[in-house]
């Protein structure tokens, strides 16, 4: 995946293998059916964003995912909840992909260190070069290179809707491990809150073919109870747009 030529074929041939690992920024079907067709190609996306006069993140929200303002609305909610008011000195993001949440996070706070775990090499290199973040080596669903209790804010956006239950669960344990006492953990999952009959009907009728585990559901109570056993309590939650329906963003605080 590091070679420039043949990148498209590599992405396509590796889809099934790589979807088992979080960290890719994915795009819904171009007909807005809510299914995952492919990983976002680096060069084509950069060209299209420049041609449209948009940032990469806004281009993905408005043109590719057809959910204009979705990223900013999530950041606005997190700001209102005081997530950035604590001025996190260290931030870790799982699967930043194109960096649309990363870029807006850096407009809200100025951490000394921002770690990323991103398996798409072209995007990881772009984020390192553009935002001076630290790209950690990826291996399955592990954050092993990051020490225990070293991160003030751990976040993952639109990641756990695309991976299996086992992968998400393993990441949950890792997120709690690396968060310092008093730190926060932010991520979204498609919980039962997002799955009323109308939403299920929308996914069934408009969601396209889906792709492997996408869209993956996760019980809200499972997340809340698990993190409670790891010393992390749910502070707040809110819904954010995803595909033809929504996903629930959960904000946890790790006990001091």
Give the ranges of each region predicted by the language model.
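Class I (Rossmann-like) S-adenosyl-L-methionine-dependent methyltransferase catalytic domain
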Residues: 2-88, 94-143, 163-166, 186-256
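A conserved beta-strand element that flanks and buttresses the S-adenosyl-L-methionine
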Residues: 155
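Short catalytic micro-motifs in class I SAM-dependent methyltransferases
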Residues: 158-159
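A short glycine-rich, Lys/Arg-flanked "PGG" loop and its adjoining helix->strand segment in the class I
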Residues: 169-181
């Amino acid at each position: 995946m590091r070679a420039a030529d043949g990148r498209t074929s590599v992405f396509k041939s590796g889809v099934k293998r790589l979807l088992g690992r979080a960290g890719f920024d994915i795009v819904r079907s171009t007909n807005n059916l809510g299914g995952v067709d492919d990983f976002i190609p680096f060069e084509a996306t950069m060209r299209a964003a420049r041609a449209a006069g948009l940032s990469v993140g806004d281009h993905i929200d408005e043109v590719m995912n057809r959910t204009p303002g979705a990223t900013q609305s999530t950041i606005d909610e997190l700001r209102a909840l005081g997530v950035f008011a604590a001025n996190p000195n260290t931030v870790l993001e799982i699967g930043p992909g194109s960096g649309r949440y990363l870029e807006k996070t850096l407009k809200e706070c100025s951490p000394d260190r921002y770690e990323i775990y991103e398996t798409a090499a072209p995007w990881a290199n772009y984020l390192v070069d553009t935002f001076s973040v630290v790209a950690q080596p990826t291996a399955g669903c592990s954050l092993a290179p990051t020490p225990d209790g070293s991160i003030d804010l751990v976040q993952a956006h639109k990641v756990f809707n695309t991976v299996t239950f086992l992968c998400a669960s393993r990441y949950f344990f890792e997120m709690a491990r690396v968060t310092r006492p008093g730190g926060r953990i932010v991520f979204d999952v498609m919980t039962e809150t997002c799955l009323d009959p109308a939403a299920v009907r929308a996914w069934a009728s408009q969601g396209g073919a889906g792709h492997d585990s996408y869209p993956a559901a996760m019980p809200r109570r499972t997340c809340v109870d698990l993190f409670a056993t790891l010393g992390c309590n749910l502070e707040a939650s809110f819904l954010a747009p995803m595909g033809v329906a929504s996903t629930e963003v959960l904000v946890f605080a790790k006990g001091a």
